[in-house]
């Protein structure tokens, strides 16, 4: 997205990462971003839920090698957030609760961790003046064969 001066606007990319499968999906997401969009200048933020009463276990990324790979090799920033409403009972709610950990005046794009980046993101016309969410609500899951 171009800003008013005609230059590309910096934005962050946000995914939720936590213990288990989402750790490794976050690593693959970050690796695909760095490979396919090496000129991306924004921050890659891994939003990580913290332990608390809504989690019967510690949801943080517990694989230290993966954590090191994300932060030191792939340049991600891990930011924590508290689960106040969803937690383990509805882990998809982490996407909503992760928003509280973001800087309010900084534009961002939220991706699911099971996404692979296949090309430069500066070709996508994100409009940060008109926030939106995916409108794909039906027929987005494969039909069982």
Which residues fall in each region the model found?
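Glycosyltransferase catalytic domains, chiefly GT-A lineage
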Residues: 1-145
């Amino acid at each position: 997205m171009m800003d008013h001066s005609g230059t590309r606007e910096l934005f962050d990319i946000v995914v939720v990462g936590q213990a288990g499968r989402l750790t490794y999906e976050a690593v693959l997401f970050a690796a695909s971003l760095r490979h396919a969009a090496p000129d991306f200048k924004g921050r890659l933020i891994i939003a990580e839920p913290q332990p608390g009463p809504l989690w019967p276990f510690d949801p943080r990324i517990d694989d230290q090698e993966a954590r090191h790979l994300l932060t030191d090799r792939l340049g991600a920033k891990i930011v924590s957030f508290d689960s106040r409403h969803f937690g383990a009972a509805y882990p998809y709610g982490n996407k909503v609760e992760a928003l509280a950990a973001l800087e309010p005046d900084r534009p961002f794009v939220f991706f699911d961790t099971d996404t692979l980046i296949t090309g430069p993101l500066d070709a996508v016309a994100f409009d940060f003046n008109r926030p939106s969410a995916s409108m794909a609500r039906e027929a987005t899951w494969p039909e069982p064969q």
